[in-house]
Amino acid sequence: MDTKLLLCDCAGSQPLNSDKIGSACEMECSKVFTALCTRELEAAAAEIQQGDTIIACGQEQEVFQALAEELNVDAPGFVDLRDRAGWSDEGADAAPKMAALAAEALLPQPVTPSVDVYSEGTCLIIGPGDVAFALAEKLAVTLAVTVLVTDEAEPMSRAFDVVRGRIKSLNGALGGFTLQLDAFQQLEPGGRGAFAWTEVRDRAQSACDIVLDLTGDTPLVQAPAKREGYLRADPKDPLSVERLAFEAAQLVGTFEKPLYVRMEETLCAHSRAEQVACTNCLDICPKGAITPAGEHVEIDPMICAGCGECAAVCPSTAITYEDPPVSALLSRMHILARTYRRAGGAAPRLLVHNAHGAEMIRLAARFGRGLPADLIPLELSVISGFGHAEMLAALAHGFARVDVLLSPTTERDALDRELALAQAIAGANALGLLDEADPDALSDVLYAQDVPQPLADPVLPLGNRRQIARLAAQALNPKAEEPLPLPENAPYGAIAVNTDACTLCLSCVSLCPSGALIDNPDKPQLNFQHDACLQCGLCKGICPEDAIALVPQLDLSDAALSQQVLNEEEPFACVECGALFGVKSTVERIMEKLAGTHPMFASSDKARMIQMCDNCRVNAQFQQEDNPFQSNPKPRVVTTEDYFSKRKDH
């Protein structure tokens, strides 16, 4: 059954063109209702019972969900056309945007993989005794509480355990915290008078499901506000402590933890042969969820909060974001741009935002100017992982400009870096970050923007993030004859080799994690493939001659897909057998430095061995007169002829 869109003009407050919306997004539209959530609720019920219905209302979702539950049918879908398009100073011209938003609502929602987290309610409270003991008394009814007291206070209740110690490390998240303590002591329950304590010992280990930090000191984990199961409160603020007790009591049971990112270890360029190369994700992760693990990195899914910054800055696409996947995000941008043009729009703009931005848009629509008719909002759960590949892809899909609306809690490190990279490829006037906290100010900025011309022939970039960025960059720079210069730390580029210093030892080839550096098995030659280079810097770091320099740039020509010779020389011919080996200039340089000067090569015969291949060198070594491994000559084999020759009568 085809999906039907129920339209409502919200008491006549917005203009709706059902014919244009329906034809552009290829969906049946109802007549335009006026009070679908109140007086015309029976009409809504009749349509919901038909199934496959989307209601153009974001404000009254709960009303229609309750109605569907009462009718014992599946809840309808929802799309907000009013706040994002209809309530606007340009609402009369917003039909193309409404069609685009309606078409986006038809797309299937991707399912994020997840894992179950189990919390049995084992709780550790850390803090001074007067506050920690009172909180433990309340929580002991529902949780298994242990108090790590930080002062000399002693409990008057045995409803919970009490220990002393100094936390050396705390790792993990909800349902799986592990900690190590020094100066650890346990309470001795027996005896009269004050409680006694066990002897002090170090390196004690323990585990718990929930950690309540009442110390008021530096947090024990990175990004404490995003570490699930780790709760903090100011011990001097009774209200925050009470709130902490309520939150902790809810953290018992089975929870669903999304697996935000996927790691492909074989693609990771973190290190090779114990030489560290790429550390982008390690440097930018705000939660400390990423740790080195040999030649690759590991991501702890229990600690990861899903900001997506690691995926945005990963040069090899070893880390990919799954909430949503890049393919699903590209599908949304594609359908928005295509439907907008199909409905008669010309130069759409894209505003990427999160839940905070959605609330600003609603406030601007209700009390201010709303959004311009050519500005299409795209809501994401997190925006910090919206990288240069996604920005370029949006422009390649046909958007004239792309802006990311920041929120007060948005991590900006990756966004700033990715924006600079995208602007170097597409130009500064087509991309930007908006840091506005006032809805009216946001509207003023959006209405005053200069809108550049969009791509005349939009393309559909596919593949991984590197492939998407390259295809989009080619579409945006069709006349680029020279490589585009990029900012430092860009994931694309070339290497410059000082041929005078390079000895063609090829150590860089053996360690290059992406295979951008290639040798030639037939002759001394160093080849390079531009599009495979990650600019990880491993070749530069391990080059014994310091002959390599990184050149961040993006070569959009076809030559970037083939091998280019960076350095080559003639091989040396063995003076004994003529076999080719080594590098001619290197062998000659060694002869110049060692022949006649080094004790091992003092004579001409010994110096000549430098000019031999490996087989001839071994033979010459064993045939020389002063060979230290040489023994007496083998005795000649005695034959019958010898016996005959010794007879006197013969």
Can you describe what each PLM-predicted range is?
Residues 293-333, 403, 410-413, 417-420, ...:
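Terminal amphipathic helices with adjacent charged low-complexity linkers/tails
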Residues 266, 309-405, 545-650:
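Flanking helices and flexible, charged tails adjoining ferredoxin-like Fe-S electron-transfer domains
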Residues 135-139, 385, 389-407, 411, ...:
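General detector of N-terminal leader/presequence modules that precede the first folded domain
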Residues 35-41, 297, 383-387, 526:
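Short acidic loop-to-helix transition motifs that present clustered carboxylates
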Residues 1-144, 148-284, 288, 347-361, ...:
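Ferredoxin-type iron-sulfur electron-transfer modules and their immediate structural context
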Residues 296-306, 497-502, 525-535, 563-564, ...:
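Flexible gly/pro/ser-rich segments immediately N-terminal to CXXCH heme-c attachment motifs
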Residues 284-317, 507, 511-514, 523-542:
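Basic (Lys/Arg-enriched) interaction patch that binds polyanionic ligands
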